[in-house]
């Protein structure tokens, strides 16, 4: 193989076909070997039984003859004994070595003596001493059967076995590949459909094949992934559009201030006023950039939580005191009730409560009340922040935690909001393993609920027990 070249891996169809062939070849080879050796053993046992039976018959004949002289007269009886057995050899030898009788296929023993014959592995033989007639003369009987027929049968069986195994393996490989190709056809169709998907066609969904179940599950999971991608892409598109819109307003204001300043000579107080107006826009941009950086770190799980035990009643009273001046200006009263111990990041906890509470104060009706209630719910510690004001439309409740989302009321005073406060709240809750929700009724009561897990935040967070909370809430 030349340097730089790579071996193309076999397709799943070919690999399964080869796998089927390998498994079948091992199975057939094992069964064939068992059948072959079983047949050989049975043939040997049959030949051994034949030799043993003929030996007993010869011994019986010899006992009936009249001594050594009577053996030739019984030639016809010995010939009948081996008739039909062309591979059978019978020898009767006197104790002095004289050959008294032999019959059968002498060619099998030609050029050999009895000792040599007994060493031939292809012959089945037995020998025994026999008594000739009533005079008590003894002789040696040797009966052997050639193994050529047995070898031919086993050879034919072996050839048939090898040929059948080879053909079976080849057919199995071909049939297995064909079946695999047919069963994987939905996968090829799925691949073609996936190749049609592009950024402009994220709404496209692949077909759900009725079978096989595995491909159907893949198609279902792929469609679910496409749905998530489409949702994420749409959110990213909205985020980009909203970001451009929200950055354009302060930048246009700054450009306008600069153009006004350069249009003619200004007095000192006029320049101070222009700089103060520009500073407001700079601060708004800074808040927006800070919020976006926090959300980016939260999305990438790049925020390490400093966990500490918090007494929620004390923390909420501290936050309500911070907003007391703004609440008094709007004739709003903030009440805190309930208490619990919570393990959370103190600064992020304050930031989440601050963002919700600032919205509650800003949108509360004059002479109304804001309730901060701590309660337990199963394995969660819940903080309810309820105010009375204009109800939030149902269609906006599902979008209220989205980035850059601002309702109609907020957009009437856009300089006071970046549209990222509640998105930051949701990110903080998710970092702690909790969630945030909002409900609004026609009676004007709007309740935001923050659910913190009682067992602390993510296990990967760094724990710092006893870390003091900040006296001043973190805004934004």
UniProtKB/Swiss-Prot annotation:
Residues 242-455 form the Histidine kinase domain. The chain crosses the membrane at residues 159-179. The keyword Transcription regulation does not apply. Pfam families: CusS (PF21085), HAMP (PF00672), HATPase_c (PF02518), HisKA (PF00512). Residues 181-234 form the HAMP domain. Induction: By cadmium, lead, and zinc. Residues 1-35 form the signal peptide. Keywords: ATP-binding, Cadmium, Cell inner membrane, Cell membrane, Cobalt, Kinase, Membrane, Nucleotide-binding, Phosphoprotein, Plasmid, Signal, Transferase, Transmembrane, Transmembrane helix, Two-component regulatory system, Zinc. InterPro entries: CusS-like_sensor, CztS_silS_copS, HAMP_dom, HATPase_C_sf, His_kinase_dom, HisK_dim/P_dom, HisK_dim/P_sf, Sig_transdc_His_kin-like_C. Residues 37-158 are periplasmic. This is Sensor protein CzcS. It comes from Cupriavidus metallidurans (strain ATCC 43123 / DSM 2839 / NBRC 102507 / CH34).
């Amino acid at each position: 193989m030349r340097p730089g070249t790579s071996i193309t891996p076999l397709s799943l169809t070919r690999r399964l076909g080869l796998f089927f062939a390998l498994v079948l070849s091992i199975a057939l080879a094992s069964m064939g070997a068992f059948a072959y050796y079983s047949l050989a053993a049975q043939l040997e046992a049959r030949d051994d039984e034949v030799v043993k039976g003929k030996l007993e018959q010869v011994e019986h004949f010899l006992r009936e003859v009249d001594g050594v002289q009577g053996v030739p007269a019984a030639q016809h009886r010995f010939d009948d004994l081996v008739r039909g057995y062309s591979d059978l050899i019978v020898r009767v030898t006197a104790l002095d070595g004289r050959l008294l009788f032999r019959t059968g296929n002498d060619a099998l023993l030609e050029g050999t003596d009895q000792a040599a014959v007994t060493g031939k592995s292809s012959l089945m033989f037995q020998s025994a001493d026999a008594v000739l007639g009533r005079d008590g003369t003894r002789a040696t009987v040797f009966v052997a059967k050639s193994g050529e027929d047995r070898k031919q049968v086993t050879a034919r069986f072996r050839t048939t076995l090898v040929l059948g195994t080879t053909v079976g393996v080849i057919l199995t490989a071909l049939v297995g590949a064909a079946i695999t190709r047919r069963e994987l056809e939905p996968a090829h169709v799925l691949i073609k459909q996936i190749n049609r998907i592009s950024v402009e066609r994220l709404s496209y969904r692949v077909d759900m094949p009725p079978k096989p179940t595995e491909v159907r599950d893949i198609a279902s999971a792929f469609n679910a992934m496409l749905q998530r991608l489409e949702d994420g892409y749409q959110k990213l598109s909205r985020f980009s559009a909203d970001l451009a819109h929200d950055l354009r307003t302060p930048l246009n204001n700054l450009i306008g201030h600069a153009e006004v300043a350069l249009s003619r000579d200004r007095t000192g107080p006029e320049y101070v006023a222009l700089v103060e107006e520009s500073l407001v826009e700079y601060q708004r941009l800074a808040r927006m950039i800070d919020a976006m950086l926090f959300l980016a770190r939260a999305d990438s799980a790049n925020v390490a939580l400093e966990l500490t035990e918090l007494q929620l009643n004390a923390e909420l009273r501290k936050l309500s005191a911070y907003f007391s001046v703004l609440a008094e200006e709007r004739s709003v009263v903030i009440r805190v009730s309930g208490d619990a111990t919570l393990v959370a990041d103190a600064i992020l906890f304050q930031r989440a409560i601050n963002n919700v509470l600032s919205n509650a104060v800003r949108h509360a009706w004059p002479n109304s009340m804001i309730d901060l209630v701590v309660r337990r719910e199963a394995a969660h510690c819940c903080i309810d922040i309820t105010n009375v004001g204009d109800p939030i439309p149902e269609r906006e409740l599902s979008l209220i935690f989205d980035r850059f989302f601002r309702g109609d009321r907020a957009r009437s005073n856009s300089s006071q909001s970046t549209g990222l406060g509640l998105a930051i709240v949701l990110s903080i809750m998710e970092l702690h393993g909790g969630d945030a929700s909002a409900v609004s009724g026609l009676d004007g009561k709007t309740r935001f609920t923050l659910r913190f897990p009682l067992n602390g935040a993510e296990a990967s967070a760094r724990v710092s027990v006893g870390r003091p909370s900040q006296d001043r809430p973190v805004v934004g």
